[in-house]
């Protein structure tokens, strides 16, 4: 293939990758028209899981599932992400502090990083990754995980959840399961 043809293909491939991975960045002349929108298969799967985990049905849920980490900066506000992330970090810290369990050596939350040191299983670290619009979990039980911020608008109320970018599992359920195992008592957020 000559250089001229290669240079013509590179922008088209870049546009195709950008459009399928980040639909909000798609130019107006791209693969979407006014009546349809482009959504990746993984974003579609996350949207379905988000609707399913909130108990939403088509009748009660607006078609407003926002997968922030796939949108680039479109629709993103620092306040919305930071508020949701800080609320979850503070909730985990408060609930663990309230348990007064011998299995917990120390729990602290500073600068968007929650550290939970256990006596026997190791350290859990949950931290904000604002540039990626994600929360990252380092677990001594299951290893590292990245969670995307998902919002679902249902009956006029917005609900935030955190879904794994790998397999779509829910962060809160993962924490409840693993902390119940480590602490030896039921842990609910």
Swiss-Prot record:
GO terms for cellular component: mitochondrion. SMART domains: Frataxin_Cyay (SM01219). Transmembrane segments: none annotated. It is found in: Mitochondrion. It comes from the Eukaryota. One of its GO terms (molecular function) is 2 iron, 2 sulfur cluster binding. InterPro entries: Frataxin (IPR017789), Frataxin/CyaY (IPR002908), Frataxin/CyaY_sf (IPR036524), Frataxin_CS (IPR020895). Signal peptide: none annotated. Its EC number is 1.16.3.1. It holds the Pfam family Frataxin_Cyay. It is an enzyme of class 1 (oxidoreductase). It catalyses: 4 Fe(2+) + O2 + 4 H(+) = 4 Fe(3+) + 2 H2O. Iron-binding protein which binds 2 iron atoms per monomer. Probably, acts as an iron carrier for the biosynthesis of Fe-S clusters. Stimulates the cysteine desulphurase activity of IscS in the presence of IscU. Interacts with IscU; the interaction is direct. Frataxin protein levels are up-regulated in ampicillin-resistant strains. Belongs to the frataxin family. This is Frataxin-like protein, mitochondrial.
